[in-house]
Amino acid sequence: MATLRQVFSISELRQKIFFTFSLLALCRIGVFIPVPGINGDRAVAYFNQLLGSSQNLFQLADIFSGGAFAQMTVIALGVVPYISASIIVQLLVVFMPTLQREMRESPDQGKRKLGRMTRLFTLVLACVQSLLFAKFALRMNLVVPGIVLPAMLSLKLFGVPWVFYLTTVVVMITGTLLLMWVGEQISDKGIGNGISLIITLGILASFPSVLGSIFNKLNLGSQDPSEFGIVSLLILCAVFVFVLMATVLIIEGMRKIPVQHARRIIGRREVVGGGSYLPLKVNYAGVIPVIFASSLLMFPATIGQFLSSESSWLKRIATMLSPGSVAYSIFYVLLIIFFTYFWTATQFRPEQIASEMKKNGAFIPGIRQGKPTQTYLEYTMNRVTLLGAVFLAVVAILPSILGRILRVDANVSYFLGGTAMLIVVGVILDTMKQIDAFLLVRRYDGVLKKDRPKGRP
């Protein structure tokens, strides 16, 4: 409580938190605004019938969008195009030496260029996905007439309802760009990572429906092991606690590398070198691999699902990449491991750490300074990252498997374990760290101001 009072007693931090919550509230408003020409109630009824209790791609997309996907609202695409664009840009940096050189020579200018590239790719991907979404809506309208209002279908060009296509594409692109802008504003002027907070908000919005699914399915008096009874509920709660604890362990765990400091002469005094440690995080990438892997699998599977009626091989791809399938689980695990290594390789700088240690007279016992220290850090980080990546993949995939065994609804297994819980817990921990860091800086700033002699600026 003391920390909470301290948080809200600082005007700047209070403004940042208020700014963040205000923009997140703006995102939630978009969930209830349907695309012009779409009957949201009929769309939700169709999706509920389509999804049922089985694990389905659309179920995952709906959870990530906070219910906007099933209602066919203006932000139905969510931030998936932005995340996919970020993956493409990060891969381009790895495979294009010119971008790498620009990032080294002028980091600020390089970041601005990558930001522009990410926005451009986001626009292109949002355009493609919104076109597919419009096509899928028309296909749904054939099954359940009235999902698309007749007025939107009256104007046609070469048999194509161009007004509906144009309206859907423009509105959904605008919704995606709005979410992208909100995410960037939160990251720059608020607290936490904006895009991650938007995803977390969407996941948390499904919590009431998850509780409803559990209570509707729960049969306390049943002795049939195939039904969801008290034993299944206890197992589900145990899985939830395990995922919660494992997520915290993965994100907070670290390998401490002992570091010694050489004796130094400061003025006329000889300062005796002391000992400290260099923390290497078990999972340096946090929940970024989970978000990237989920979004990357969702993109081709969405295309396959939207166009499955027109091609048998696309239908097979959509079925193969449906959440809960063996192929989906294998690809998901491999992508999590890949993105864990990929993100660590792009963010962890062993050569810079080794250089700073040599400059400050610090060394790892038994390891020479310079290149040997860099090699040792790379080797150690690779081993630690392997452990973290495998652990992260197991935690992400295990609850979905147990969910199928316990015969619970897909939204329950998604929320109480695996992907959703990893993202929610990881983002909350990251946001809390940012708040703690802000409080620490203000505390030191306050001490410096207090100890500053009068008359000095």
Swiss-Prot record:
UniProt keyword annotations, A-Z: Cell inner membrane, Cell membrane, Membrane, Protein transport, Translocation, Transmembrane, Transmembrane helix, Transport
Subcellular location: Cell inner membrane
Alphabetized InterPro entries for the sequence: SecY, SecY/SEC61-alpha, SecY_CS, SecY_dom_sf
Source organism, top-level taxon: Bacteria
Residues annotated as transmembrane: 17-37, 75-95, 118-138, 162-182, 195-215, 230-250, 287-307, 326-346, 386-406, 412-432
Recorded topology in the membrane: Multi-pass membrane protein
GO terms of biological process kind: protein transport by the Sec complex; SRP-dependent cotranslational protein targeting to membrane, translocation
Major location (coarse): membrane
GO molecular function, one term: signal sequence binding
Gene Ontology annotations for the cellular component aspect, listed alphabetically: cell envelope Sec protein transport complex; plasma membrane
Family matches, as PROSITE patterns: SECY_1, SECY_2
Record has Cell membrane as a keyword: yes
Effect of I401V: In strain: L2/434/Bu
Pfam families cross-referenced by the UniProt entry: SecY
Coiled coil regions, renumbered to chain: none
Family: Belongs to the SecY/SEC61-alpha family.
Assembly behavior: Component of the Sec protein translocase complex. Heterotrimer consisting of SecY, SecE and SecG subunits. The heterotrimers can form oligomers, although 1 heterotrimer is thought to be able to translocate proteins. Interacts with the ribosome. Interacts with SecDF, and other proteins may be involved. Interacts with SecA.
Described purpose of this protein according to its UniProt entry: The central subunit of the protein translocation channel SecYEG. Consists of two halves formed by TMs 1-5 and 6-10. These two domains form a lateral gate at the front which open onto the bilayer between TMs 2 and 7, and are clamped together by SecE at the back. The channel is closed by both a pore ring composed of hydrophobic SecY resides and a short helix (helix 2A) on the extracellular side of the membrane which forms a plug. The plug probably moves laterally to allow the channel to open. The ring and the pore may move independently.
HAMAP family reported for this sequence: SecY (MF_01465)
Protein name listed in UniProt: Protein translocase subunit SecY
